[in-house]
């Protein structure tokens, strides 16, 4: 059998694109500037087209990954006139951009790829540091990987709730919405994710937590990992292992 035959036989329940639906693959700078609307970023699915068509033709559901992330999100998305050298926009402008971006992604996919079922979306990805604090104010070009342009604009992690509000508003009816993160078993991060998830759950905005689970045979211990799972499960939300890999020290 061919490689694709094996995919269709053994991995036909779900596919997550590694990069093709991330902001820097989907956002279209030239079209955004040409639109004349400073609050309406345009999107283009050209780089995801082959995968989307494949999933539609083979009836393989897709987990959307990801909408709001500090990484692989171009700085021009946060700047005046969608320009690389523009000034950083204010919070109100960025909220409008966030809503229109999520709207354009959801509606564009539904219109252009009606045969593709998006059963889930990672709405926000990796917003908390290991100690449970928000990322630092920065940009996608910062040498500090702990920095975020979202935090630069909003001052904190308040953008998370807005992202889930807009995703809930525009996502397909039965699509589940997730928060996704790595090192989710670090105590400070576990607590931050738990508290955030409970607040979002009370408002009906979140359906589950994605545990990336980039593990090593030496860390975390099984009991540490289990403790995080139990903590997240106590929210009553769906818990999914989303990016599992286990490395060895040798």
Across the structure, where does each feature detected by a protein language model lie?
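Short amphipathic alpha-helical segments and helix-helix/interface helices
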Residues: 4, 49-52, 164, 197, ...
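Glycine-enriched alpha-helix->loop->beta-strand junction motifs that scaffold or abut catalytic
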Residues: 11-15, 205-206, 235-238
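Substrate-binding cleft and catalytic face of glycoside hydrolase catalytic domains
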Residues: 13-31, 37-178, 182-184, 248
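Short, acidic/polar
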Residues: 2-10, 98-108, 187-200, 225
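Active-site clefts of carbohydrate-active enzymes
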Residues: 175-186, 211-217, 232-250
């Amino acid at each position: 059998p061919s490689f694709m035959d094996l995919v269709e036989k053994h991995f036909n329940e779900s596919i997550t694109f590694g990069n093709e639906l991330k902001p820097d693959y989907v956002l279209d700078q030239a079209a955004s500037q040409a639109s004349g609307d400073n609050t309406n970023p345009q999107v283009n699915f050209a780089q995801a087209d082959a995968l989307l068509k494949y999933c539609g033709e083979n009836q393989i559901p897709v987990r959307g990954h990801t909408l709001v992330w500090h990484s692989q999100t171009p700085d021009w998305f946060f700047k005046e006139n969608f320009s690389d050298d523009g000034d950083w926009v204010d919070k109100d402008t960025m909220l409008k951009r966030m809503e229109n971006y999520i709207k354009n992604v959801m509606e564009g996919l539904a219109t252009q790829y009606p045969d593709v079922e998006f059963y889930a979306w990672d709405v926000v990805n990796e917003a908390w540091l290991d100690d449970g604090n928000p990322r630092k104010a920065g940009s996608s070009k910062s040498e500090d990987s702990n920095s975020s342009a979202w935090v630069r604009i909003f001052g904190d992690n308040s953008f998370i709730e807005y992202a889930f509000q807009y995703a809930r508003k525009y996502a397909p009816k039965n699509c589940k919405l997730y928060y996704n993160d790595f090192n989710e078993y670090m105590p400070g991060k576990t607590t931050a994710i738990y508290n955030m998830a409970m607040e979002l759950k009370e408002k009906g905005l979140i359906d589950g937590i994605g545990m990336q689970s980039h593990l090593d045979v030496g860390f975390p211990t099984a009991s540490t990992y289990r403790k995080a799972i139990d903590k997240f499960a106590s929210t009553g939300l769906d818990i999914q292992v989303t990016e599992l890999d286990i490395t060895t020290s040798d």
